A protein has these predicted regions:
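ABC ATPase nucleotide-binding domain helical subdomain, centered on the C-loop/LSGGQ "ABC signature"
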Residues: 3-43, 87-88
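ABC ATPase nucleotide-binding domain "signature motif"
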Residues: 35, 39, 43-55, 80
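Walker B catalytic motif
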Residues: 44, 73-74, 78-82, 86
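ABC ATPase nucleotide-binding domain "signature" region
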Residues: 49-50, 56-61, 85
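A short, proline-enriched helix->beta-strand linker immediately N-terminal to the Walker B motif
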Residues: 63-67
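Conserved catalytic loops of ABC-family nucleotide-binding domains
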Residues: 89-108
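H-loop (His-switch) and adjacent beta-strand-loop-beta switch element
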Residues: 103-121
Length: 121
């Protein structure tokens, strides 16, 4: 289910799950499913697009409130607008130390970073 894919059977409230789904811009999509959080996923995510699967994995990480995250191409399967919204939501957490690895970092996001290292070949 959506719930299990996020919680991996750990104890999180529905409110925590919905909050993290909103953070990754997946809340409306899950609300549209027949059983919401308890919608059963089949065949490697079945009805979810590649970008939705990527956001589900991101929700699984974010709900655990780790103090340090390393995200490698975490929004690569998303359109630019959605990627920026999610990255802004993640960067809004001032308690989080975040290392982002990306081939395409938007200027709006880059301006919010404490430091940005660009590797050029």
């Amino acid at each position: 289910s959506i719930r299990y894919n996020i919680t991996l059977d750990e104890d999180f409230s529905d409110e925590e799950i919905w909050n993290v789904l909103k953070k990754v811009c997946l809340d409306e999509r899950v609300k549209s499913l027949d059983n919401g959080l308890d919608h059963e996923l089949e065949n490697m995510g079945g009805i979810l697009s590649g970008g939705e699967k990527q956001r589900l994995v991101l929700a699984r990480v974010l709900i655990r409130d780790y103090p340090i995250l390393i995200l490698d191409e975490a929004t690569s399967a998303l359109d630019e607008k959605t990627a920026i919204r999610i990255e802004n939501n993640i960067l809004a957490d001032n308690q989080l130390t975040l290392i982002m690895i990306s081939h395409h970092i938007q200027e709006e996001i880059k301006q919010q970073l404490t430091e940005c290292v660009e590797l050029k070949v």
